[in-house]
Amino acid sequence: MPGLLNPDKPAIGRYTRRIDPIRNPYTPGAGSRPPALTGRDDEIEAFRILLARLKLGRPEKSMLITGLRGVGKTVLLNTFEAIAEEQGFRTAKSEITHETDFRPLIARLARRALLAVSPAKRMKERARRAAAVFKAFTLRTPEGLEIGVDVEAMLGRGDSGDLGDDLSDLFLALGEAAAEHETGIVFLLDEVQFLDRAELEALIAALHQVSQRELPLTLAGAGLPQLPALTGTAKSYAERLFRFPTIDRLSEQAARAALELPAEAEGVSYEPQATERILELTEGYPYFLQEYGKHAWTAAAGPTISLDDVERAHDLVQLDLDESFFRVRIGRATKAELAYLAAMASLGDGPYRSGEIAAALGRPGPESVAPTRARLIEKGLIYSPSYGLNEFTVPQFDAFVRRSFPPEAPS
């Protein structure tokens, strides 16, 4: 294949770069779409069915994807966005953070969605009504967003100060406007677990109202594994309103395809032992597959990636993961929280019992470290798969913690 090999390229660091690095197909990065999106067909098909039912005016559960860090939740949301737009839906997407003020955020998304449904100068009756409700809703936000439509705020709709009532008014008005214009609206929210309970209650209540009216408005969201429990705590009927597909590491077949197909498209192949070694090191996690593919490509001295290439790449992959994937997760952790994480990791593979973590810290019982545990869950570093148990939200995080933060001796 022309341009594939570059034999005159000088040695750089530990690698002799002879496969063109510009054509490296692997894309490690937050939310970066992999060149071969494998193992997610069921979730994509479920989303297509959701959209098809909305088009027919039939209620269907919204989707909240759950999974650990690095399994491709954001990639899947981006794929959903593209599918929705291809099918004529209007989309508005954002990411929730610890600092998110939800009311202004949802107002910005609503504005984007409404103007996509109908430009300001061509709004029909329902769209103008939605603009009036939006204007009332934003009276309660500090930003004073404008919609660009000469309408008065619809007092009594969206302006009560109760987020649940106001968001329901806004979503109903948006859904009616979308139906009038023969389209639909898909809100896409990432990191939904960072919403507080009141915000989550309001979002669920608003979607419930929309579903009861069979309006073409839905939510596709993503979050960490604790999300189903959080929604159930916020509203008891959440399980009847949402579908919670859990995505995890890829199957061996899907992982192999995610690794080998992008290289094959560029005329590069893997020795069988090289593929097996990468599958072993990555455990099938999509982000890790992209990292190893990227560095193995760079390490290769020819159009076949060998086991030796993978072993040469291993140290740099580990360094990249430590600095760009693992370490960034703990930037907001306190000394006490780091000690808790180190105690967890010292126990080996999870899940980890709260009592055993307390004992590793030299504390009398789980109650003594419960506040630290709660803060770590709130920050998205650990989650509780069941009562009294704890797990890291990041694959292979235990090994990183053992390398970087050895446990302190119990005092």
What name fits each language-model region?
Residues 1-61, 123-126, 410-411:
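A short, basic N-terminal segment
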Residues 4, 10-14, 23, 61, ...:
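C-terminal leucine-rich, beta-strand-based interaction scaffolds used for sensing/assembly
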Residues 59-79, 361:
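Walker A/P-loop nucleotide-binding motif
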Residues 81-100:
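Conserved catalytic segments around the Walker B and adjacent sensor/switch elements
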Residues 86, 101-122, 140-145:
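Conserved NTP-binding/hydrolysis module of P-loop NTPases
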Residues 154-225, 233-235:
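Conserved Walker B catalytic segment
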Residues 233-248:
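A short helix-turn-beta junction within AAA+ P-loop NTPase domains corresponding to the substrate/partner-engaging
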Residues 255, 260-324:
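Amphipathic alpha-helical "lid/sensor" segments that cap RecA-like P-loop NTPase cores
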